[in-house]
Structures are given as structure tokens and as C-alpha cells.
Amino acid sequence: GQVLELSGAPEELLARVDEGATLYVSLADGLPAGFEPVVGLEPQSRERRREFEPITLSGVSGEPTLPACGSHRVRHRATHAQVLGTEADGSPAFTVAGYGRGRVFYLNVPIELYHTSTPGSFHTEGAPESWRVYRHVAADLLAGRAVSKSAPALAVTEHDLASGERLIIAINHSPEALVDRLALSPGWVWSEPLRGSVGADGTVVL
């Protein structure tokens, strides 16, 4: 295992959070040390994981569950963090805490490592809806987008152009054809697509 010193993170990173940015942190098998002022959690114990009941994110839209992955588990006590998800025994698993004018989200399992080492964990039936974590973390940013989408496997990026327009790029990350609707925010209209097609109601087929 490793000992993480989050308080020793690059000063520029925490300075940006202090000024209003959002930071997301997930834990693998390390034992966090000295990060309570940043994350709002106080580590209580660390042990090899013996309980594998799913984590429930009751504070996230859709109340998804995530696999209790990772070789070790750290039990925490919330000090000033808001608990958004818990393990089966009620121990904090997904939290958010204020840091200056910004926020720090913390996930107590290495969901990214799980996805990179588990074939089909993104798109097969019963795959964990971990995308809901990122949508929750990025909610404020997404609110300022010109378009919104529904399909988790559809990636959408926006790029400002000098003309005051935005270039929208949509990519299907699933192995099958995908149909979704790109809903425009007020004040935006579609121009002629550079590639592919967009229906009058924003429907795309990729």
C-alpha cells in the first residue's frame, strides 16, 4: 500500500480549488494521511477488503450502485464532508466537501482501475453506472453547455470558435450503433453539420 499526503498536492491545484474549481479524487489501496482539511474525512482504519456488497450512491441522481472494488478498504468518519454514498455498513464511500470557494469530491474505491481491468464493464448488461458519478461532479460545468445528451456512451465536446459559434463533436464509444437526442440550450440553433446529420429535433445516429 501507499501513504497519500493530499495536503502535499501541488499548491497550484489546491489554489485553483480554493478559488472555485472542483477536484475529484478516488482511492486505490493507499491510506490517506493529513487530508482531512481538504476532503473532510478522518481515516479510522485500513484493512484488506473482506466485504464486497455494492456501494450505494443515495445522493446521486438515479441512486446507482458501484462495485466494492479494490484490494483494501479505508473506513472514514465524516468531519465536514457531506456523504453522498455509503458502503453496506454505512461507512462514507462518496463525499463532497467545501474547500475555499471550491469543492472536493472523494470516492473511496478505485472505480477507474476496475473499468480498465474488467472487460465489458462499460457497456454490457448490468454494468455499473459509474458515469453518474462524473455527471454529478461536473453538474455545474454541464449546465453551461450549449447541448445536453442522455446516452452514457455518447461523448460530446464543445469548442468555441472566433465567430461566436461552437463546434460540437459527438463520438459513440459503444461497439454498437447509437441513437440519442442532442438538446439545445436556450439561445442556440443548429447550423449545417460538417459531418454526419442532425435531425430537426437534435436526433443523431452514430
Question: Could you say what each language-model-derived stretch is?
Answer:
Residues 1-206:
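A conserved amphipathic helix/loop scaffold
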